[in-house]
Each structure stands twice: as C-alpha cells, then as structure tokens.
Amino acid sequence: MTAEGDNRVLMIKVVKDMLSIYMKNPEFVYGGEFIKIADKNELFCLKTVSVIFQMIEKFKLDRLINKMTTLKGNGASNYDILMFETSDEIQELALAHGEKLAILHCIDSLEKLSASKEVMRNYFLLFAWEVLLRELSLMLLEGWICPKLAGELREHYNALIKKAAKDIDVVIDSLNIPVHALQVPAAKDYIKYNSYPNYGEVVGAKL
C-alpha cells in the first residue's frame, strides 16, 4: 500500500518494467497459439485455463503498445501517455500480469501437494473462474470460449463455491493466520465498523 492508500498507483512501475523486459525479450510473454475453450473438461483444467490467463496478458500488452505507439505518433508526451491517456490499460495489464503469475504459482504448488490436493484445487479453480467471469466479454469477442460454456460458467462457479465452502475453516487454519488478524477490519470505515458487532472481514464475509 502507498501513502495514498491505493496500491494501484504502483501498477505503472510494474508495466514499465514489463515493457522494458518485453522489448529485450519478447518471449517474456505468451508466444504460442491462442486456444479456444470448447469443452467442459478444459474449463475444469487449471493448465488449460492458465493458457487463457497468458493470452489475456498478451492481448492487453499488445493493446497498450499499439495505443502508446499511436499516441506518440500524434505528438503526445511520455508523461501524458503514461499518466492520462493509457491509465486504464496500464492498470488492466498489471492486474493481468499478477493474475498470470498467481495461477502459474497455484499450478506449481498443486503438483507438490498430496492429501490437500483436491481441496486446494477447488480454491485455485475458484480464483481462476472469477477472473474468467470478469474477462468473459473479451473471451467471447476474441473467440477464446464457446458461447455455451460461457453461459454455463457462472453456474459452475456457484456450484464450486458450495462444494469448497465446507473446507473453508481448514483452509484458513492451514494459512496460519493469527486469530486476532481474522477479526481486523482490513479496509472499512473504522467508526462505522466499531458501531456494531462486526467479526472481521474474513470471518464475517458472506461467501
């Protein structure tokens, strides 16, 4: 978190580093063929879904570079391009990059698990589907998912939440989060928070 209380201002730093690395090494991002999720089994496969994450990152990187190039050609200054003209694209790309790293780490971690593998797979899949739901319009427009599966994704997501909910206490315990930290309001109005019984954003979350 920054002094302004918004970690999104750091995203420009992430993207500037990404652009610098990409210009020297284009293989830094996904360079394979773009796929299409057309089968339910592919939707439930984390490795297949991770390719979509990489495609989203590549799409948003290309979109940003193209817009920056056009603006630069029209005489816009580097400052105006970064701070005003491409602010939304920069934030979206930084988020996509972080989510790609997260899903790849999830897959790597899953391969090292045994007893808790199925439990954690459900939670990793929930994370992945939440991202896909947010990016569903892009995926449909680009032909990365068939319309039928796109229409069923929310139903699969809700069903998996119900399935995973029974393990939530075990999962929280496995993260070794101190009990007192579960009761701390992470980002709420403290005056309002203390005006009524509120047992923490984690414990009290309505999932």
Describe every region a protein language model picked out.
Residues M1-L207:
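Flavin-dependent oxidoreductase catalytic core characteristic
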